[in-house]
Design a protein with these regions (language model features):
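Nucleotide-sugar donor-binding loop of glycosyltransferases
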Residues: 18, 71, 150
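Acidic donor-binding segment of Leloir-type glycosyltransferases
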Residues: 1-16
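Glycine-rich, basic loop-to-helix element that forms the pyrophosphate-binding segment
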Residues: 1, 17-33
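C-terminal subregions of glycosyltransferases and related glycan-biosynthesis enzymes
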Residues: 157-219
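Short aromatic/hydrophobic "clamp" motif used to bind/position activated sugar donors
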Residues: 38
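Donor-binding/catalytic cores of nucleotide-activated saccharide
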Residues: 22-23, 43-146, 157-170
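Residue-level signal for alpha-helix termini/capping positions
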Residues: 7, 31-34, 60
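Acidic helix N-cap motif at the loop->helix transition within catalytic regions
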Residues: 1-5, 28, 46, 50-52
């Protein structure tokens, strides 16, 4: 099917690779990427027609953007959980302002366009769950301007059998480790972010009974 789809499309490359997980697939794509910007679409998901053109138009208007985040339908297909996460037209020159302003709540790799050079020396960790939360802060640290837009739309399909939906102790530990890895990057934390981390820590303890590792801060 993939071979037929790329016939006659000189701008498409078909890569064959054994299934090594999401991070390995993205990393292989990054090794072969040639354009100025890169983005990702997971195998269960899709984008609204016209999204690519709309986002490239935003990037043409704002060549200073190193990362551009756009709206996403969360848990598409699950009417009880489906939710639209949208954004205003905004630019952040501080990674800290973006992250503590709520960016930590939507660390998805897929509803963003990245300047390809940001991935120089940065790859997704193979074998870890919540790899997005681990990798995004590295990219934010290298970005000069992070933009958000209300244009375009990504559909994040609900998968009750997916790894994140069935996250247990090990997976939640990966998520907590991802946030702790970058804690010093943000300086003084907001109470809302610390509360989010505390909730993750409590979930980890509930699942594993391992001693808490989240630093105790005066909130």
């Amino acid at each position: 099917i993939a071979s037929r789809m790329i016939q006659g499309r000189a701008n498409c490359t078909l890569i064959h690779q054994s299934n090594q997980g999401l991070s390995a697939a993205r990393n292989t794509g990054l090794e072969h990427a040639k354009g100025e910007y890169v983005t990702f679409i997971d195998s269960d998901d899709f984008i609204q027609e016209g999204t690519i053109e709309a986002l490239l138009a935003v990037l043409d208007m704002h060549p200073e953007y190193d990362i551009l985040e756009y709206p996403v339908v969360q848990h598409h297909g699950n009417k009880q959980c489906e939710k639209l996460l949208t954004f205003s037209e905004k630019a952040f020159t501080s990674a800290r302002d973006y992250w503590l302003g709520g960016g930590y709540q939507h660390t998805y790799a897929c509803n963003k366009y990245y300047r390809r050079r940001l991935f120089e020396g940065v790859r997704y960790p193979v074998g870890k769950v919540f790899e997005d939360a681990y990798t995004l802060p590295f990219l934010l640290a290298k970005a000069g301007v992070i933009g958000t837009t209300g244009r375009g739309l990504y559909y994040y399909t609900d998968n009750p059998q997916g790894i994140t939906a069935r996250a247990g102790g090990q997976e939640l530990t990966h998520l907590l480790e991802a946030h702790l890895r970058h804690l010093a990057q943000w300086g003084t934390l907001t109470a809302a972010y610390y509360e989010s981390l505390l909730n993750i820590q409590m979930d980890v303890y509930e699942a594993t009974k391992a001693a808490p590792v989240l630093p105790v801060l005066p909130y």
